[in-house]
């Protein structure tokens, strides 16, 4: 058998979207491994490469022959293989004939339906050169692309038009045809610095050959290069770069041969709010803003050019011109927008549709006024401030700056509110009320912003659920999952004891009689949706599914309280050796009480205790009851569980010493009533019967 050889696959294409490059590389490395496994080809490590113009895979030590593929074929039941006279049936003979063997050569295989006739076929090993072209094509068609393109006369599709193919194992170029192209043994270098073909002699030499052709194919190495060069240049300039991970990834995805340079703009533009300047630089130009030692923006920025110019100043001047035009627009809108107050703009919101069936944006602000003011006590903020902030929070949607840069909604509203003379509390609430807009965004830092943000998200959630615009499967066109997650994150991270049932009920009430559907049904659907989000959120925080089920069955509507119970329960189970035994004991109590009926609020009468163990448990409970209820009232669940854990010896003795289901109905009711007290205490924290091992 030939020794294994490295495999190299490359698709050369038009510029790939920067944000989709790493997901594409990750998907390709995962899929190629699955395809090689399925084909019976053994292999070593997989290295993925991606640049704006290529996706490549280097797989080490791919075997030259596949492992023999074994196929197990199943035939008729053994009981139906012969007739009453012992002669083979037509079904049995037909199966043997299809396998190319005699009936006596067939195997017997045990199955759920009983023993069946079977035949195990072992295929022959195949040459990897014959298998790999088909594997390469299947890789391309299996990639989970957001959108596929077709070009020319062919039917093959990819994220961008493909211009060349490369498929080589060891020293052999393989016969791969796709996109109307034949794979060769060549790649191509940098579009400007080395547009000629680059001969790739071996898979291991791929990255080095392209480096000589001015292409850094390794995304991680290219990223580290850009980060290091920017840090060094910023250090020389005595500034600090504003370089989030996502921006660094995007810059990396825009460049094959990154050269880091510094540009500048007129200091007069610094009068524009820095959020607008940062948005223009980062999100529209992919430039890196800079802060000086006083933490304020400076009129300089960093950027990566995708080439090494003989005259770098020409490149810098070109980027400066582009940025100057964008900043001039921002400054113009900033000056113009402040001439009209948010209050004046508000009336025009009546002409801006929020959603069919839910009225205008002005209607939404009216609902938010009512809801934010109602929620204000839970955030310890003034209802008047919240009413005012809610009234004005959407007015900046009609401003020129937000029209040009929609991502500044809310943020610019806060600046305009301050300019209009609104107090800082109102301005801050307006500025922060869209947060968190993404999974990794910070929540509003101020209680006023938190209150208005939750009101805004609840109004959206309740409205869309009411008109039947509910997320289904992977589809969530109105980002309702994100809105629900935003509510949960604010409540949990800010420590707000919000009751979702009450909040949703109040939100639906603010819509008045606008809905044809039954409001109770809408409310139930929204609360179920929140419960699903809580399960996912708490799982991501590391809690077990059974712990979450145990807690949410008792506290489904207060996320903060639910998390406090979860933390106490998880700690209790981790630190108490007898936690599982206690849970099993509680399950036994639950089972008894589920089968028996306790007459009303049956009082416990010690005169009916027939055994000392009953007195022991009753005395322990009486001593425990008051401090336990005090801990539960203060939501000190860890301390409460510690107290309840002390019940276990007395409960064990109780079950060992008495027959709970005594024939005497008075004794039986007395004992069941005592157990019901214990059950009720545990249920005030969680349903322990849902815990694993209980």
UniProtKB/Swiss-Prot annotation:
Its EC number is 6.1.1.14. InterPro entries: DALR_anticod-bd, Gly-tRNA-synth_bsu, Gly-tRNA-synth_heterodimer. It catalyses: tRNA(Gly) + glycine + ATP = glycyl-tRNA(Gly) + AMP + diphosphate. GO terms for biological process: arginyl-tRNA aminoacylation; glycyl-tRNA aminoacylation. It comes from the Bacteria. GO terms for molecular function: arginine-tRNA ligase activity; ATP binding; glycine-tRNA ligase activity. Its main location: cytoplasm. It is found in: Cytoplasm. GO terms for cellular component: cytosol. The keyword DNA-binding does not apply. Keywords: Aminoacyl-tRNA synthetase, ATP-binding, Cytoplasm, Ligase, Nucleotide-binding, Protein biosynthesis. Belongs to the class-II aminoacyl-tRNA synthetase family. NCBIfam families: glyS (TIGR00211). Tetramer of two alpha and two beta subunits. This is Glycine--tRNA ligase beta subunit.
């Amino acid at each position: 058998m030939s020794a294994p050889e490295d495999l190299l696959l490359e698709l050369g294409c038009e510029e790939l979207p920067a944000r989709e490059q790493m997901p594409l590389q990750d998907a390709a490395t995962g899929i190629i491994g699955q395809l090689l496994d399925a084909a019976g080809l053994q292999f070593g490590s997989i290295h993925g490469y991606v640049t704006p113009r290529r996706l490549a895979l280097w797989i080490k030590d791919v075997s030259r022959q596949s492992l023999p593929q074994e196929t197990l074929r199943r035939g008729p039941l053994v009981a139906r293989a012969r007739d009453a006279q012992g002669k083979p049936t037509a079904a049995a003979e037909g199966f043997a004939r299809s396998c190319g063997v005699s009936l006596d050569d067939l195997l017997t295989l045990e199955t759920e339906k009983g023993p069946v006739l079977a035949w195990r076929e072992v295929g022959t090993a195949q040459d990897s050169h014959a298998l790999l072209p088909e594997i390469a094509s299947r890789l391309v068609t299996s990639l989970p692309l957001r959108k596929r393109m077709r070009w020319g006369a062919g039917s093959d599709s990819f994220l961008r038009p493909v211009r060349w193919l490369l498929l080589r194992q060891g020293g052999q170029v393989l016969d791969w045809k796709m996109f109307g192209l034949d794979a060769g043994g060549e790649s191509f270098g940098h579009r400007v610095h080395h547009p000629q073909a680059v001969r790739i002699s071996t898979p291991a030499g791929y990255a080095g050959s392209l480096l000589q052709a001015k292409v850094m194919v390794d995304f991680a190495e290219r990223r580290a290069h850009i980060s290091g060069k920017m840090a060094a240049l910023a250090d020389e300039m005595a500034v600090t770069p504003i370089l989030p991970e996502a921006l660094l990834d995007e810059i990396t995805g825009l460049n094959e041969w990154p050269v880091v340079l510094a540009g500048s703009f007129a200091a007069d533009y610094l009068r524009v709010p820095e959020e607008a300047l940062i948005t223009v630089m980062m999100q529209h130009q992919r430039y890196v803003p800079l802060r000086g030692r006083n933490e304020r923006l400076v009129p300089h920025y960093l950027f990566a050019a995708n080439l090494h110019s003989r005259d770098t100043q020409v490149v810098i001047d070109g980027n400066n011109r582009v940025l100057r035009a964008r900043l001039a627009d921002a400054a113009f809108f900033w000056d113009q927008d402040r001439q009209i107050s948010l209050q004046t703009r508000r009336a025009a919101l009546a002409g801006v549709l929020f959603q069919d069936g839910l009225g205008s944006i002005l209607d939404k602000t009216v609902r938010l006024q009512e809801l934010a003011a109602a929620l204000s006590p839970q955030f310890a903020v003034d209802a008047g401030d919240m009413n005012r902030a809610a009234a004005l929070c959407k007015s900046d949607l009609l401003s020129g700056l937000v029209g040009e840069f929609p991502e500044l909604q809310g943020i610019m509203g806060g600046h305009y509110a301050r300019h209009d003379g609104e107090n800082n509390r109102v301005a801050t609430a307006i500025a922060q009320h869209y947060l968190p807009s993404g999974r990794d965004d910070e929540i509003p830092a101020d209680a006023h912003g938190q209150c208005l943000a939750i009101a805004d998200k609840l109004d959206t959630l309740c409205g869309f659920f009411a008109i039947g615009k509910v997320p289904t499967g992977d589809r969530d066109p109105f980002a309702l999952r994100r809105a629900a997650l935003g509510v949960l994150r604010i409540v949990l991270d800010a420590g707000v004891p919000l009751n979702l049932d009450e909040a949703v009920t109040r939100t639906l009430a603010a819509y008045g009689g606008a809905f044809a559907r039954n409001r109770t049904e809408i409310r139930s659907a929204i609360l179920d949706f929140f419960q699903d989000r809580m399960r996912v959120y708490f799982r991501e925080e590391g809690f077990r599914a059974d712990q979450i089920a145990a807690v949410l069955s008792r506290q489904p509507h207060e996320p903060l309280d639910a998390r406090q119970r979860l933390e106490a329960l998880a700690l209790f189970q981790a630190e108490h050796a007898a936690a599982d035994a206690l849970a099993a004991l509680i399950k036994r109590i639950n089972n008894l009480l589920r089968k028996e009926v306790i007459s009303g609020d049956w009082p416990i009468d010690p005169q009916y205790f027939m055994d000392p163990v009953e007195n022991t448990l009753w005395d322990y409970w009486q001593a425990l009851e008051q401090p336990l209820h005090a801990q539960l009232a203060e939501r000190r669940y860890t301390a409460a569980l510690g107290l309840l854990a002390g019940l276990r010896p007395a409960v064990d003795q109780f079950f060992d010493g008495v027959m709970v289901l005594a024939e005497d109905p008075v004794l039986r009711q007395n004992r069941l009533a005592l157990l019901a007290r214990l059950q009720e205490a545990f249920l005030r924290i969680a349903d322990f019967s849902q815990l694993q091992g209980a």
